[in-house]
């Protein structure tokens, strides 16, 4: 194959990336390792905290990022999926990548692909995104990078890094077609990110998954820090109290809503404290407290409208939906009208999710809808009419805003891609 010289590409970087979305994600690391070698292994230029989990990855990374920023450390974060634009996936100190940096870094990866495809197939979309993140963080000279796993861990594209620490936020049933049909099988995939002799922070894992993590951790001689064992969190009237073997910290307020976010906060804080201790870095207690009070994470219990209140939450699997329902039950006062607008992808357990919402929130009005994404559920998936279905979410929201009282709440939940679609309506 004849290589194209620099500047001869017929596509822009964005067009090239869009074209690569048609290629299925490859589960294997050889091609990615070759690519990073061509890019001079930028992932070796900074310490990395590698984060996996069924749910809670993004929120945990958001809190970790805030903790590092408030300590004055330059932190990069790679997250997925993006809610508005590709650049949302790449963050430095919480700020999204500029269009200029996107073009420059994307072009570097595209040039490397020209050499790569002499022996390998073209890169997949997620391989490009991961490579761009690792190059970007090196160019910006971050002091620490937070890397979110795409799916699983063991064979995930991100698992070519030699991380300083690993984190598992949670383990539940999701992506069974790729990860396995039991919690043990899924745990094997997620513990695949563990590295020899590293510190590992484990969230609130089910017993079956925790047992796998302990076996793998022992095999790799990892220093395991487990929720409710090495560290814990307690909700009090004026915030919450975090405790581990070294310290006890009172946090007046957590800006992220939902009881489950307390567990994510505990994981983030334990990870942060271990990292700073390992590198013998000083810690400002007031900065820790402030970081939790200002942290935000788009699309996760995000209030996008007041009077009436409209809240977005990407509860994209049954495990996350249970946490969502728990929060809804705690919200508001008796008699307040709650409306749930839900959509998901057909490949998910959407019928089980709808049934769960109907069972657990019988007083709420449940509305199912579709959205512009290949594989989204449609009205034909509910032919009997037993579920209220609207074809277009945008007019529904517009009507809701004009007719609902200030005491009513609209919860919009389901697929993260649905949340992205809805968020564009509010963030114009």
Label the predicted regions.
Residues 144-147, 156-167, 171-175, 185, ...:
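Nucleotide phosphate-binding/pyrophosphate-handling subdomain across enzymes
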């Amino acid at each position: 194959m004849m290589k194209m010289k620099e500047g001869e590409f017929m596509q822009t970087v964005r067009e090239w990336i869009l074209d690569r979305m048609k290629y299925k994600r490859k589960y294997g690391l050889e091609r990615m390792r070759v690519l990073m070698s061509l890019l001079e292994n930028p992932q070796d230029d900074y310490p990395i905290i590698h984060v996996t989990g069924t749910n809670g990855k993004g929120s945990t990374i958001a809190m970790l990022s805030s903790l590092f920023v408030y300590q004055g450390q330059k932190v990069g974060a790679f997250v997925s999926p993006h809610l508005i634009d590709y650049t949302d996936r790449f963050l430095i100190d919480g700020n999204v990548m500029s269009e200029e940096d996107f073009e420059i870094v994307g072009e570097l990866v595209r040039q490397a692909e020209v050499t790569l495809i002499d022996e390998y197939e073209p890169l997949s979309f997620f391989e490009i995104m991961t490579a761009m993140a690792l190059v970007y963080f090196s160019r910006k000279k971050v002091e620490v990078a937070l890397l979110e796993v795409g799916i699983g861990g063991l064979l995930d594209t991100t698992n070519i890094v030699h991380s300083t620490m690993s984190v598992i936020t949670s383990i539940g049933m999701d992506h069974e077609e790729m990860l396995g049909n039991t919690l043990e099988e899924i745990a094997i995939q997620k513990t695949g990110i563990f590295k020899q002799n590293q510190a590992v922070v484990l969230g609130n894992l089910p017993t079956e998954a925790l047992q796998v993590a302990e076996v793998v951790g022992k095999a790799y001689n990892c220093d395991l820090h487990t929720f409710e064992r090495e560290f814990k969190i307690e909700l009090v009237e004026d915030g919450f109290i975090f405790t581990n073997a070294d310290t006890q910290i009172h946090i007046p307020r957590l800006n992220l809503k939902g009881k489950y976010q307390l567990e994510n906060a505990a994981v983030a804080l334990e990870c942060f404290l271990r990292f700073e201790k390992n590198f013998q870095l000083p810690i400002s207690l007031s900065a820790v407290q402030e970081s939790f009070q200002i942290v935000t994470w788009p699309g996760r219990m995000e209030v996008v409208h007041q009077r009436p209140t409209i809240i977005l939450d990407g509860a994209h699997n049954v495990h996350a939906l249970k946490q969502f329902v728990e929060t809804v039950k705690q919200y508001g006062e008796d008699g307040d009208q709650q409306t749930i607008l839900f959509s998901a992808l057909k490949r998910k357990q959407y019928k089980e999710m709808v049934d769960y919402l109907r069972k657990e929130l019988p007083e709420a009005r449940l509305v199912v809808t579709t959205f512009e994404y290949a594989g989204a559920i449609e009205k034909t998936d509910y032919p009997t009419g037993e579920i209220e279905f609207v074809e277009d979410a945008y007019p529904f929201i517009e009507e809701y805003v004009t007719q609902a009282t200030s005491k009513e709440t609209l919860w919009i939940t389901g697929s993260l891609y649905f949340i992205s679609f809805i968020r564009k309506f509010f963030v114009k």
